[in-house]
Regions:
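Outer membrane beta-barrel
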Residues: 19-37, 48-182
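Solvent-exposed loop segments that connect transmembrane elements
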Residues: 42-44, 89-96, 184-195
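N-terminal periplasmic/intermembrane-space "pro-region" immediately following the signal or transit peptide
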Residues: 1-31
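Loop-centered beta-sheet repeat module
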Residues: 174-202
């Protein structure tokens, strides 16, 4: 697979007295990720993965609003787009695949002194510490927690909703902590029902 990436700063933060908009830094970016897989010779001939599919195209929007001292209010939204499904390109996406997905949506406070506290759908502590450093090639995550649990976006191993997360650096140590709040039932479509009551990571 290969990707084309870009990020543009639409508003650059430069706080000025009497100008609330000058406190805002706003960026947009993303990556387009076409992918081709040929893992089993002719055994998968004609499959959408062999024909070419979307390997995780996403577009992101990030805002950083300076409040006072070294404290900022931050917000982040990342939209996943399945381009072949969006344009209905036959044999280039899985049956039933959605056109778009909400990859992340969170908000919170950031401080160089006190750290960062955010709430919403965001990368897990596990992904920040392990996944982000090893998720380099296609299928790297199959052997990680998100590839082995019921659903990484639900069980807390990847990008769970309703997550409160804190991170900060103390000397040479990076500290990450999170708490997962109860979520609605997850129905994978195989007759099973999962219910997340809570959870946490450190």
């Amino acid at each position: 697979s290969f990707a084309a990436q870009a990020e543009i700063t639409l508003l650059k933060q430069d706080p000025q007295a009497g100008d609330p908009l000058s406190r805002l830094n706003f960026t947009v970016g993303g990556s387009i990720r076409p992918q081709f897989n040929n893992m089993t010779g002719d055994g998968d001939k004609g499959s959408y993965k062999r024909n070419g599919f979307d390997g995780g195209t996403r577009f992101r929007f990030a805002a950083d609003y300076y409040l006072f001292d070294d404290i900022s209010w931050i917000s982040y939204y990342e939209l996943g787009v399945n381009i072949p499904a969006l344009f209905d390109w036959d044999h280039h996406y899985a049956d039933g695949a959605r056109n778009t997905s909400r990859r992340m949506l969170y908000t919170g406070l950031k401080s160089n002194t006190w750290g960062q506290m955010t709430f919403g759908q965001q990368n897990s502590v596990y992904y920040d510490v392990v996944g982000a450093k090893t998720d380099i090639w296609d299928y790297d995550m199959l052997a990680q927690a998100p590839g082995n649990g019921i659903n990484g976006d639900y069980d807390g191993s990847y990008r769970s909703r309703k997550m409160l997360k804190y991170k900060n650096r103390f000397g040479d140590a990076d500290v990450y902590a999170s708490y997962l709040f109860s979520d609605s039932d997850y129905l994978p479509g195989n007759g099973l029902r999962y219910k997340r009551k809570g959870g946490g990571s450190l």
